[in-house]
Amino acid sequence: VKHIVFAHRKLSFGGGERVLLEQVAALAALPVKVSVIFRKEPGKRDIEPELRQRNPNVAEVLHLPGTFGAFSWLRRTRPDLLVLCNHKGVQRALPWLARLGCRIPTAVTLHEHYERHLGKYRGIRNQVDRWLCTYDFTAAVRDRLGPAPCAIIHPLYPRPEARIVPAEERRIARRHLGLPETGTVVGYVGQIDGRKDPAGVVRFAEALEDTHLLFAGREEPDTAQALDLRLAASPLGERTLRLGPLPELGLAFAALDLYVMTSRNEGFFPLALIEALERGVPVLAPTVGGIGTVLKDGEGGFLLAKADDRRSVPEALLVAAAARLKPLLADEALWAIHRAKAHAFGTALTRDYDAAAKFREALSPWL
């Protein structure tokens, strides 16, 4: 039986962890043994139950944070394939293993085209057999990491057919959350950290003026503190609701008129955007990562034409977007058309794409 090892940064909820989960699930029907090792947050194994449920061949899920532990374990187990994503201990162990004649076939999942992301793998680029890119940044990989083959696998996974949230359900969701049943509600739902730059969401909402603001999702401590200070100085301070992490985010999405993302940088196309769109919630998002290659302005969402430079969305762009969207949000009939476009685009996005088959095809030489 072939042994496939997935080495990942962490197992708490996040976009990269969703990709890991779907990669593991893609091998469920094959006669292979699967191990998962990770390096950070040993007490946050959020996705472990679903990993085991989606693939009964998961034999072990191990916290192996350091180089020596990863080296010893890999040397002992000698897997048939290593699928790696941002596990520093494993990355440091691989050259030492190779020097001792233990050459492990390796595929690396790349979520972003940024130098900071690709540069992590420069030290092992000659030991990588395949790069797994979430969107087409092959040229950057060739330039910075060398000639190993690239497979383009978008993280678009089958989802239950969602329906557009009707007005009455939106009112019920707002009442349940303590928001006004009428009026404009904009916000962000998902992991809240420095990269997501929630201060940009606040600035956009301030420029809209007559609105309520909603945040839902786990807040990274430093970002939460910065958001506290930002809201304390904002006229929206008393009209902002922060729900923190929730077991089910459906109510938060349902309450929104507009989903606002102001990330400094992103990967292919964040799952949260899909979750908003498929419910009929139009999105406002920056042209970073793969977002601008997928979302067309006015067809379910609106784009902030931001340079892909890992910096905050410029204030002028946020203010201009608010000026553009304010009259659209105020026109219920017109906004209903944008809701319908969002729903149609969001549900079609994942319907006919088989990421699992593409993943198995990319790994087929070792399966």
Predicted regions located by residue number:
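A conserved mid-protein helix/loop that constitutes part of the nucleotide-sugar donor-binding site
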Residues: E17-A25, T184, Y188-A207
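Glycosyltransferase donor-sugar binding loop
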Residues: V36-K44, V189, H212-A226
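Nucleotide-activated donor-binding/catalytic signature segment of Leloir-type glycosyltransferases, i.e.
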Residues: N55-A59, A226-P245
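Short His-centered aromatic/hydrophobic patch
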Residues: L84-V90
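A conserved, positively charged/aromatic
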Residues: C102, T106-D136
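Short hydrophobic beta-strand element within catalytic cores of glycosyltransferases
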Residues: P282-A285, L295
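A charged, aromatic-enriched C-terminal amphipathic alpha-helix characteristic of glycosyltransferases
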Residues: A316, A330-S364
